């Protein structure tokens, strides 16, 4: 099982959960799917920023060379077929359809709101509390993310509808202040689907949408079917057998610190033999990269010709023309294979022949992060009844 005793995050001090909220609709148990949408627009990225983001998200100190690389002026202008589009999920928040990021590594539902200056909401859908919305007097929230972005504001109880299932008194965290990073992002906010114990609302944390609607679902599960360079799907209340091959392999979840934590039992690089070793980590749709123990990362890049751990670029890089090996994670006997092309994250800057690796070190975090580089290779079942995680190849 995963141990997170070294994790030092302020929100872990919040232990009291908000009461479960009503779910509208009939007594019939529900199932539904959420299709991500392709949000067009050119987005400029520095690959090292994503690495720094992930380290900071979990309280790790970012090495100086990664900080320097993340702050560098070099950037990547995304292309239509690879990195140019952001995939978001349309969700009805108090009568407004908002495109939100779904993040299994956090537990807040926060959105752009009319409490922000209009100059900061251009291009975004905005949540407007109505006469039926209930302001929670004395309640507030504040979140800081890895890239230095932040948001804070007030808390309302309002209805949130996803796929025909409505939580009629869902805690909606309405942004009153927001940093420029969010203003420039196409997302209208975030829906966290980790466990409610790490919701950041004070003085009393609130339940996630998933926790609030579980009793109205046919099964207390949601499934992530993320895709490589394409929109994915989230299934709620059922497991779609048409989206995976073979059987689903389950492993226990340690949710003691609010995350979907699990332990892998080994790995393999390319066609090499399996190395048996315990890898404790979490499944996080809100992190781009796959972060693993440095010893494993070194062994992977030892098989990539021309690779190096670059102080200039803040992580492992290699010639974009290099042939990468696949990477396999062993979970309860199941071998989850990540295709080689997934592991080339992006060029380090526009026009460069040097690429940034999708696997980087988890140094300083205390556990590994199985982010989108890994998750989009699998159909992943988040099952609250165990709790447990299930994995099957797409």
UniProtKB/Swiss-Prot annotation:
CDD domains the UniProt entry points to: Aspergillopepsin_like (cd06097)
Chain segments annotated as coiled-coil in the UniProt record: none
Location, primary (coarse class): secreted
GO biological process: proteolysis
Residue positions of the active site: 103, 284
Family matches, as Gene3D superfamilies: Acid Proteases
Domain Peptidase A1: 87-392
Subcellular location: Secreted
Keywords associated with the record: Aspartyl protease, Disulfide bond, Hydrolase, Protease, Secreted, Signal, Zymogen
Catalytic reactions of this protein: Hydrolysis of proteins with broad specificity similar to that of pepsin A, preferring hydrophobic residues at P1 and P1', but also cleaving 20-Gly-|-Glu-21 in the B chain of insulin. Clots milk, and activates trypsinogen
One matching Pfam family: Asp
Molecular function terms, GO-annotated: aspartic-type endopeptidase activity
Propeptide positions: 21-70
Uppermost EC category: hydrolase
Annotated GO CC locations: extracellular region
Leader peptide range in chain numbering: 1-20
Annotated S-S bridges: 320-355
Enzyme Commission no: 3.4.23.20
Assembly description: Monomer.
Function: Secreted aspartic endopeptidase that allows assimilation of proteinaceous substrates. The scissile peptide bond is attacked by a nucleophilic water molecule activated by two aspartic residues in the active site. Shows a broad primary substrate specificity. Favors hydrophobic residues at the P1 and P1' positions, but can also activate trypsinogen and hydrolyze the B chain of insulin between positions 'Gly-20' and 'Glu-21'.
Family under the similarity heading: Belongs to the peptidase A1 family.
Protein name per Swiss-Prot or TrEMBL: Penicillopepsin-3
Lineage of the species this protein comes from: Eukaryota, Fungi, Dikarya, Ascomycota, Pezizomycotina
Chain's gene name: pepB
């Amino acid at each position: 099982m995963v141990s997170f005793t070294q994790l030092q995050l302020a929100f872990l001090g919040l232990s009291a959960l908000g009461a479960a909220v009503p779910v509208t609709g009939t007594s019939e148990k529900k199932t539904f799917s959420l299709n991500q949408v392709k949000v067009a627009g050119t987005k400029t990225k520095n690959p090292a920023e994503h690495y720094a983001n992930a380290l900071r998200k979990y309280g790790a100190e970012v090495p100086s060379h990664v900080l320097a690389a993340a702050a560098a002026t070099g950037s990547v202008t995304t292309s239509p077929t690879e990195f140019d589009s952001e995939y978001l999920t349309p969700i009805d928040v108090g009568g407004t359809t908002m495109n939100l990021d779904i993040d299994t590594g956090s537990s807040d539902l926060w959105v752009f709101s009319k409490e922000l200056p209009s100059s900061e909401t251009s291009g975004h859908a905005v949540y407007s509390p109505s006469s039926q919305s209930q302001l929670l007097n004395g309640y507030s929230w504040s979140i800081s993310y890895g890239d230095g972005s932040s948001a804070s504001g007030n808390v309302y109880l309002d209805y949130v509808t996803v796929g025909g299932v409505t939580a009629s008194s869902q805690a909606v965290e309405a942004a009153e202040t927001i940093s420029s990073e969010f203003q420039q992002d196409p997302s209208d906010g975030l829906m966290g689907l980790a466990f409610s114990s790490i919701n950041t609302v004070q003085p009393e944390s609130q339940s996630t949408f998933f926790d609030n609607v579980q009793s109205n679902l046919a099964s207390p599960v949601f499934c992530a079917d993320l895709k490589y360079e394409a929109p994915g799907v989230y299934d709620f209340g059922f497991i779609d057998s048409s989206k995976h091959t073979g059987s689903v392999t389950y492993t226990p979840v340690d949710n003691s610190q609010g995350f979907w934590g699990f332990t892998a039992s080994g790995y393999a690089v390319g066609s090499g033999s399996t190395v048996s070793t315990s890898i404790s980590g979490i499944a996080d749709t809100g992190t781009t990269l796959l972060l693993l123990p440095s010893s494993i990362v070194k062994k992977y890049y030892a098989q990539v010709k021309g690779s190096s751990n670059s102080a200039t670029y803040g992580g492992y890089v290699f010639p974009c023309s290099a042939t990468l090996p696949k990477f396999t994670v062993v979970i309860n006997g199941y071998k989850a294979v990540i295709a080689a092309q997934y592991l080339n994250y992006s060029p380090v800057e526009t026009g460069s022949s040097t690429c940034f690796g999708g696997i980087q070190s988890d140094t300083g975090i205390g556990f590994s992060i199985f982010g989108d580089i890994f998750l989009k290779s699998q159909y992943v079942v988040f099952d609250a009844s165990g709790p447990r995680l299930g994995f099957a190849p797409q």
